[in-house]
Amino acid sequence: IFINVKCSLPQQCLRPCKDRFGQHAGGKCINGKCKCYP
């Protein structure tokens, strides 16, 4: 699931993804945007 958060590193996506989808969520940075894996 893509969220509207800009990124340049995967680590930048972990916190926003966890905030939205819970502690077990993961995140990657794809084409400058965060993609969450709930």
Curated annotation (Swiss-Prot):
Keywords: Disulfide bond, Ion channel impairing toxin, Neurotoxin, Potassium channel impairing toxin, Secreted, Toxin, Voltage-gated potassium channel impairing toxin. Expressed by the venom gland. GO terms for cellular component: extracellular region. It is found in: Secreted. SUPFAM superfamilies: Scorpion toxin-like. It comes from the Eukaryota. GO terms for molecular function: ion channel inhibitor activity; potassium channel regulator activity; toxin activity. Disulfide bonds join 7-29, 13-34, 17-36. Its main location: secreted. It holds the Pfam family Toxin_2. The record marks 37 as: Aromatic residue of the functional dyad. The record marks 28 as: Basic residue of the functional dyad. Weakly blocks Kv1.3/KCNA3 voltage-gated potassium channels (Kd is estimated to be 366 nM). Has the structural arrangement of an alpha-helix connected to a beta-sheet by disulfide bonds (CSalpha/beta). Belongs to the short scorpion toxin superfamily. Potassium channel inhibitor family. Alpha-KTx 02 subfamily. This is Potassium channel toxin alpha-KTx 2.10. The lineage of its organism: Eukaryota, Metazoa, Ecdysozoa, Arthropoda, Chelicerata.
